[in-house]
Amino acid sequence: MPSPPEPPLHWRDCRLEPILGFPRPRELAKSLEVQGEEWIALLESGGGLQHRSRYSFLAWGRRKSSETDAIRAYEELERLADDKCRALPCRSPTFFLVSYEAVVGEEPWLSRLVGRHEWPGMTAFSPEYVVVYDHAGGRVSVCPGDTPLPAPASRKESFSAEGPTYETSRKGFEAMVADALERIRAGEAFQVVLSRVERYRVWGSLFSAYERLADANPSPYLYYARLGGRVIIGSSPELLVKLEAGRVETHPIAGTRPRGSTPIEDIELEVELLNDEKERAEHVMLVDLARNDITRVSIPGTVQVTSFMDIERYETVMHIVSRVEGVTRPSTTFVEALKALHPAGTVSGAPKPRAMEIIAELEEEARGPYAGAIGVAGSSAGEAAIVLRSAWLLDDGETLEARAGAGIVYDSKPEREYMETVQKLGSLKRALGVDMCG
């Protein structure tokens, strides 16, 4: 496949500065938070994964924004996506979050099953100011060029949390797993990804919690977003979709182990994971599902698995990751590519329609941001991560919600799947400073 062109970082109305000595993304975002800015999107790259860690974005101020229900989420995002944004990074991206339930826009029959969440089906804004950090090129582009940078924050923001004040109990989650196993063994599905929720009471600035999370668990997709009265923080490892120069890709993650306490134990767990027949079979199935999804917007014969079953390590867990790519049909928009892949099979199951039905029946409440998509959208270019290892503020302004899931297949053990959700929530709970007992 042809490589995308080297992106120009110096747009006509922007100023270009060396990255050395320029305020870091988090420093500027913290200053904006302290000053009371209502619209902020900070998308950072970390984790040392060079193929996914070149750019970080900071955007603030609101030129236009939109919030809509799940049924109209894709349609409204298509309307907002800037038609001048055709390559990444772009001068005028739309920053967005689409909920898991936005799938009802393409699968309306699901609307009778899924509930409504406090968060909208889609929320997005086009910023007044954008700063793009090119870590590989050592450059920063400030747009527009006369953008006044916020003064350094002079006060330290406090944060504290307690809880969980509510959670899906171990007994309740293991009962859900047992129910899903009966359905899988009856032939209704091959895999169902079930999640459990935890809620915490919080005080102070969530930006402080984001800083702790980003430091403790650097990932390719770190984000802090203040969208009017809504706030979300996250450290996602998984790319849902990237579209650039007529090429679309997704990076399915399936297969998890906890990190070892020593380098030797870490290697032993990696070998165990890669040789686990259940984990391998689950991963292959979800790679095939990703191939099928990408085929919906790709030229026949162009879809390829360009890397297969690599190991990526994070603070508390390691994962098996693959990469699937295709060449898109002419005039494919970013939102069309997003629709083809959302929600990912890695957070729903296979076959996807029946798995989503079972999820709705067993979880009994809307997921909201969890397993949705967050990122930047243009007309024919964009990039979005799956909302994982994340927490979002509810409408009362003092309750933070988080979810984690596990893929259930025919030989799953309920207690093991519960512990996987505990491990996945580990970094987030440490950042919040709440009880880690599982």
Swiss-Prot record:
L-tryptophan binds at S45, P220, Y221, L222. Mg(2+) binds at E282, E420. Its cofactor is Mg(2+). It holds the Pfam family Chorismate_bind. It catalyses: chorismate + L-glutamine = anthranilate + pyruvate + L-glutamate + H(+). GO terms for molecular function: anthranilate synthase activity; metal ion binding. Feedback inhibited by tryptophan. It is an enzyme of class 4 (lyase). Keywords: Amino-acid biosynthesis, Aromatic amino acid biosynthesis, Lyase, Magnesium, Metal-binding, Tryptophan biosynthesis. One of its GO terms (biological process) is L-tryptophan biosynthetic process. Its EC number is 4.1.3.27. Pathway: Amino-acid biosynthesis; L-tryptophan biosynthesis; L-tryptophan from chorismate: step 1/5. Chorismate binds at G255, T256, Y370, R389, G405, A406, G407. It comes from the Archaea. Binds 1 Mg(2+) ion per subunit. Part of a heterotetrameric complex that catalyzes the two-step biosynthesis of anthranilate, an intermediate in the biosynthesis of L-tryptophan. In the first step, the glutamine-binding beta subunit (TrpG) of anthranilate synthase (AS) provides the glutamine amidotransferase activity which generates ammonia as a substrate that, along with chorismate, is used in the second step, catalyzed by the large alpha subunit of AS (TrpE) to produce anthranilate. In the absence of TrpG, TrpE can synthesize anthranilate directly from chorismate and high concentrations of ammonia. Belongs to the anthranilate synthase component I family. Heterotetramer consisting of two non-identical subunits: a beta subunit (TrpG) and a large alpha subunit (TrpE). This is Anthranilate synthase component 1. It comes from Aeropyrum pernix (strain ATCC 700893 / DSM 11879 / JCM 9820 / NBRC 100138 / K1). The lineage of its organism: Archaea, Thermoproteota, Thermoprotei, Desulfurococcales, Desulfurococcaceae.
